[in-house]
A protein has these predicted regions:
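Short, glycine-rich nucleotide/cofactor-binding loops
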Residues: 5-12, 104
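Residues at alpha-helix caps and immediate loop-helix transition turns in enzyme cores, especially N-
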Residues: 15-16, 106
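Short beta-strand segments
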Residues: 32-34, 93-96
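Glycine/threonine-rich flexible loop motifs
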Residues: 99-108
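Small-aliphatic-rich amphipathic alpha-helix that forms the alpha element of a beta-alpha
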Residues: 110-112
Length: 112
């Protein structure tokens, strides 16, 4: 199974590392996450600007990891259109460091 993992807390967030570690039991794992914190970005995408994509060394063996100088939605687009040779079977978003409940879901970068 091919798994794409994204988040809105950034490539260095502890939650995404734990999710990648646990997901390795299920198959091939790709982590494509924002270079920095991008909470409350919802479905925002970057237009009319270049997006920097950087391969990252990751402390979870076997994980392919990239940081993206853009939003969580940009991360998904970049992964699907440029990085992954085949579409993922599943996309996980998180693990979030804050709550995504009630009205917060409308602007959540994790949910967006």
């Amino acid at each position: 199974m091919r798994i794409l993992i994204v988040n809105d807390d950034g490539i260095k967030a502890p939650g995404i590392r734990k999710l990648a570690e646990l997901s390795m039991q299920l198959g091939e794992v790709w982590v494509v996450a924002p270079k920095s914190q991008c909470s409350a970005m919802s479905q925002r995408i970057t237009l009319f600007e270049d997006i920097e994509v950087t391969p990252e060394s990751y402390d979870v063996d076997g994980v392919r990891a990239y940081s993206v100088g853009g939003t969580p939605a940009d991360c998904v687009k970049v992964a699907l259109e440029f990085l992954m040779p085949e579409k993922p079977d599943v996309i996980f978003s998180g693990i979030n460091s804050g709550y995504n409940t009630g009205i917060d879901i409308l602007y959540s970068g994790t949910v967006g």
